[in-house]
Curated annotation (Swiss-Prot):
This is Serpentine receptor class gamma-33. InterPro entries: 7TM_GPCR_serpentine_rcpt_Srg. It comes from Caenorhabditis elegans. One of its GO terms (cellular component) is membrane. Its main location: membrane. The gene is srg-33. Keywords: Membrane, Transmembrane, Transmembrane helix. Belongs to the nematode receptor-like protein srg family.
Length: 321
């Protein structure tokens, strides 16, 4: 079970989830220093991503890192196609596909939020605050029509001899599930690309300035789109080359091997990008968790300078800009 691949994923995924939780606590603590709609989307993303992360251990991580006679193999041998399971494995497999829809749609919403900020900077916040409850309902409900058939199905683990590991499957035709998922992902990816291109083009043509913080969050949403595009390509590869006829081929093995890493990219990259692109986020993060090393960048003329402080109270108001 504890293969090099499994250890590698744990090496970066556990620190990433800890950092994710720390940044969520940070934006909640310094809520006045960030856009309210951005905070709401960030926290919702965190909830969905943490569910995805822990669910992946059951549907992807542990099965893919368990050989035929490994310590944990008895769990998978007891739920084969000859002895399929229903609850709760069907729920975990349902969540596996459900979250693919939810994550892609949330990346689109993040880009849409930045798009509306660029084009309607004076009114976008009020509009998003009013619409946000309905947006969340849409995020929750939207994947259900595409994934509900998994819930009443029989679910099991299949052993792949060439890779000496297990994978999750169900009585629902795999091609049927991917034939629904791929058009959705392609449509959302294209829509995300269009609004990101429009946002960056508008940014270069603007005669007035938006805050550096808002601009950097736009760059963050653009970077999330790149990860989304990679996930789309890998999912397409899974659909085209992983089937009963060639599931033991090299391309099938590559697609299956990359799946947990691509999933991690969608799930764990947010806090790293947030801190990388947002100076304000880095300041608030340092102020909250490492106050002795926190730096402020405020002067009487609003120019930027950095000073080291020893007390949180010295910079409590200075981080807003």
């Amino acid at each position: 079970m504890f293969t090099l691949k499994f250890g590698t994923t744990l090496l970066y995924s556990i620190p990433s989830m800890i950092l994710y939780a720390m940044t969520v606590r940070m934006v909640s603590r310094f809520s006045k220093d960030f856009s309210r709609t951005f905070i709401q989307l960030y926290i919702v993303f965190f909830v969905f991503n943490i569910i995805t992360f822990f669910n992946s251990f059951i549907t992807v991580r542990i099965p893919q890192n368990t050989c035929k006679d490994c310590f944990m193999s008895f769990l998978f041998k007891s739920h084969t196609v000859l002895n399929p399971s229903w609850f709760p494995l069907n729920v975990f497999y349902f969540i596996h596909f459900y979250m693919a829809y939810a994550q892609f749609f949330l990346i689109f919403l993040t880009s849409l939020n930045r798009f509306s900020m660029i084009f309607w900077s004076a009114t976008y916040e009020k509009a998003w605050n009013r619409a946000f409850p309905f947006v969340i309902i849409l995020v929750i409900v939207l994947p259900v029509p595409f994934t509900y058939t998994i819930l009443p199905s029989w679910t099991y683990y299949a052993y792949t001899e060439t890779m000496d590991c297990y994978s999750t499957s169900s009585s629902v035709d795999r091609g049927f599930l991917y034939n629904q998922l791929l058009p959705f992902m392609a449509t959302i990816t294209i829509a995300t690309a269009i609004i990101n291109i429009a946002s960056f083009y508008k940014l270069t043509c603007m005669t007035y300035k938006i805050s550096i913080a808002e601009r950097n969050l736009l760059f963050m949403s653009g970077s999330l789109f790149i990860v989304q595009l990679l996930a789309d390509v890998n999912t397409t590869l899974n659909r085209l080359v992983v089937n009963d006829n060639n599931k033991f081929g090299i391309w099938s093995q590559i697609a299956v091997t990359l799946l947990p890493y691509i999933s991690d990219g969608l799930t764990l990259i947010h806090p790293w990008m947030f801190l990388a692109f947002s100076t304000k986020a880095r300041r608030c993060f340092m102020l909250m968790y490492f106050p002795k090393y926190a730096k402020v960048a405020v002067t009487a003329t609003n120019s930027v300078r950095f000073v080291t402080v020893n007390k949180r109270s010295q910079v409590q108001d200075a981080v807003r800009f």
